[in-house]
Amino acid sequence: MGLIKNTVHYCCVSRDNQILYSYNGGDQTNESLAALCLEKSPPFHTWYFETIGKRRFGFLIGDGFVYFAIVDEVLKRSSVLKFLEHLRDEFKKAARENSRGSFTAMIGSINVEDQLVPVVTRLIASLERVAESSSNNELKSSNLGEQSEGSNSTKAPLLGRLSKQEKKKGKDHVIELEEHRKSNDRGNITDDSAGAGTSLEKECVSSSGRSVTQSFEWKWRRLVQIVLAIDAAICLTLFGIWLAICRGIECTRS
């Protein structure tokens, strides 16, 4: 089997939505699609991935630059992230070699395309080899699994293939977000032990809530009792002072 071709459809380096370098795999719509994506670059992220259809969109953001790629879904996010990191390193290296002053000040006038073309070509070829190697490994694992299951049941290979396809499909449609933002949405299947754990957690929360409420009520009653006792003591003190001044109830007689 030859190399998997056209895994990288588009990649570019941009700053303030201005593209400083770009590679296009051939489809002219990639440029307009990339411009749209760059306008919507996710803020507060160092890197970000999203899979739509059969394409994966990757962002690497840092120092005011955005390194963006549109790749095939067969490529793993870890491989694409390494590709973007290499693109960043090579771009900065080429920029520094062509500039004598500040890197950020002179970046607009630097012609780095001639240096980046062979580098990006090499990076894409390396990425395609990684994808092809992963595909071959998955195919071998699938064949071995089907052979071992075939000796036990005629239906087992079919079930095994279906399970692997579902797992692969679910894995490829995962959207990478700061990381943890959508982790609670990825689990759609719960077993009995998970249900029991959830029930136990709810009971603990409910019990804790009741305990807090009871403690609050007790403190409130205690506070009311103290206020009433102080009020009664003040009233009795004032009444005693009044009796002492008026010598009993003589004031009322006059």
From Swiss-Prot:
GO cellular component: membrane
Membrane-spanning ranges: 226-246
Membrane-related topology note: Single-pass type IV membrane protein
Subcellular location per the Swiss-Prot or TrEMBL entry: Membrane
Domain Longin, first and last residues per copy: 12-113
InterPro entries noted in UniProt: Longin-like_dom_sf, Longin_dom, PHYL
Gene3D superfamilies in alphabetical order: Longin domain
Disordered: annotated span: 138-173
Keywords, in A-Z order: Coiled coil, Membrane, Protein transport, Transmembrane, Transmembrane helix, Transport
Polar residues: compositionally biased ranges: 145-155
Principal location class: membrane
One GO BP annotation of this record: protein transport
Function summary: Non-SNARE longin protein involved in membrane-trafficking machinery.
Record protein name field: Phytolongin Phyl1.1
